Swiss-Prot record:
Family classification: Belongs to the TFIIB family.
Protein purpose: General factor that plays a major role in the activation of eukaryotic genes transcribed by RNA polymerase II.
Name of this chain's protein: Transcription initiation factor IIB
Binding site for Zn(2+): 6, 9, 26, 29
Keywords for the protein's UniProt record, in alphabetical order: Metal-binding, Nucleus, Repeat, Transcription, Transcription regulation, Zinc, Zinc-finger
Predominant location category: nucleus
Gene: TFIIB
Lineage: superkingdom: Eukaryota
GO molecular function: RNA polymerase II general transcription initiation factor activity; TBP-class protein binding; zinc ion binding
This protein's GO CC annotations: nucleus; transcription preinitiation complex
Gene Ontology terms: biological process: DNA-templated transcription initiation; transcription preinitiation complex assembly
Amino acid sequence: MSDSFCPDCKKHTEVAFDHSAGDTVCTECGLVLEAHSVDETSEWRTFANESSDNDPVRVGGPTNPLLTDGGLSTVIAKPNGAQGEFLSSSLGRWQNRGSNPDRSLILAFRTIANMADRLGLVATIKDRANEIYKKVEDLKSIRGRNQDAILAACLYIACRQEDRPRTVKEICSVANGATKKEIGRAKEFIVKQLEVEMGQSMEMGTIHAGDFLRRFCSTLGMNNQAVKAAQEAVQRSEELDIRRSPISIAAAVIYMITQLSDDKKPLKDISLATGVAEGTIRNSYKDLYPYASRLIPNTYAKEEDLKNLCTP
């Protein structure tokens, strides 16, 4: 339910949606506020085909404003039976011969959706990545470039812009063979192209160590007390002049916190969970070590407990 202004009640009230009739109804007085509205989302009901074991839906997906026809094109089905198969295959050939300017876009959007699903990303990030790709594709400047790297870079930029950043290594793990270097180059290319087109710098969003911390801690199976201590330590680290990448700082803080825990984590495991090299974690830890008493909350470890930390 949601709220809407009811002219009879003279106030905002909760409204109910009658999907079968397309009506929006006030729950307090029963007034129909809107009638015969069109639901453009995908239909959830299915209707079984009596002649087969399939259970197809009657309609396709929701409209997509990035496609020429809104994604509402007609698809020729293939019925059972010898005569039907001959007819449908002939029609299908004619349909495939017809020009579809959105075919490459549909394939690109499908690839982006698959990558996003594998990373557990929300729909808003998928939509933003689709928008970025559509803008770049319209500029006709990506022909001849590594398509997998371009799509992965669009997803990386979308994560940054939606304040849900992922590391390049995480994006690379679902990028269908594109390397970190290729994705990095594609990202720089896309940003440059769009900045030239817009005539202004492209907002990418600022990365903080805390953006990655909870996900890394979850991967390592850290308890809630250790996670909270790590989050507070990361926040305090922003007050210091530590010239390391946010990902490296997050990894070093985890290394520091787990040393003071009963459930210690080997440096190798932290490296695998964060994607940061062991040597880089050691160097970042070396920079953080002198500030351990300022970083680690007293509720997690006392001053004398800090002596248990490894000397870098």
